[in-house]
Amino acid sequence: MDNQKKYHHGDLKNLLIYQVLEAVKKNKLESFSIRDASRLLNVSAAAPYKHFQDKQSLIISSIVYCQNIFYSYLNEQIEKNTFSSHMQLINLGKCYLKYAFENPELFTFMFSLPLSGKERLHNYDKFHKLFVYTIKENLDEDSFRKRVSKSSAVNAAWSMVHGIACLIASKTISDEEVDGYINGKSFEEISAIWAVGVSKPPKYKL
């Protein structure tokens, strides 16, 4: 009984999020219910509502959780990589695409619903700063075209990478194309397209 009480009060919030993510992986989110999850976790039907107001709030918390995991993964890849600085943007982009390929359901889920203003800005800012840091390391400050701001350059890079990631997660493009982006030269090609559009031309730091 004591173990169940500890389980109920200590881990229930995260375990409910885990149940949502399992439903996402199995494409069963629509039929997911807090009541069924409570039964599976052997807690009272009322217990989850001490953590979440309703199913929607649980789903939103699960999205934020997913985005935090994704951000940590990308940040870890940046910190541990041994690439020269001009390869960091390519490395970040390829890791972004690889995550979408290996976790298609979760990737689609984490960007599927709009968050509240505060949550949206917080999560946007984290991903935005990753690209800002990488581009800053990749290009000199005076490399951008006069009519291109750093913010626009960052958003263009992020949009390009995220768009391809969505194509990968939704299985819209072939496995051969996916492999080209993650392991081949395709990503270098779109990086060159981005660089031509925002720079005059880029001056890579060696």
Where are these regions (language model features)?
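Basic, helix-initiating cap at the start of DNA-binding domains
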Residues: 1-27, 36, 57
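Alpha-helical DNA-contacting segments of helix-turn-helix folds
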Residues: 24, 60-66, 110, 123, ...
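Append "Primarily bacterial transcriptional regulators
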Residues: 20, 32-39, 48
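C-terminal peripheral helix-coil segments that are non-catalytic and often amphipathic
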Residues: 133-141, 163-206
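Amphipathic alpha-helical packing segments from all-alpha helical-bundle domains
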Residues: 68, 75, 87, 117-141, ...
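Short amphipathic alpha-helical segment with a characteristic S/N-K-E followed by hydrophobic residues
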Residues: 31, 54-59, 116
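Short secondary-structure transition hinges
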Residues: 102-133, 176-180
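Hydrophobic alpha-helical connector segments
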Residues: 76-105, 150-157
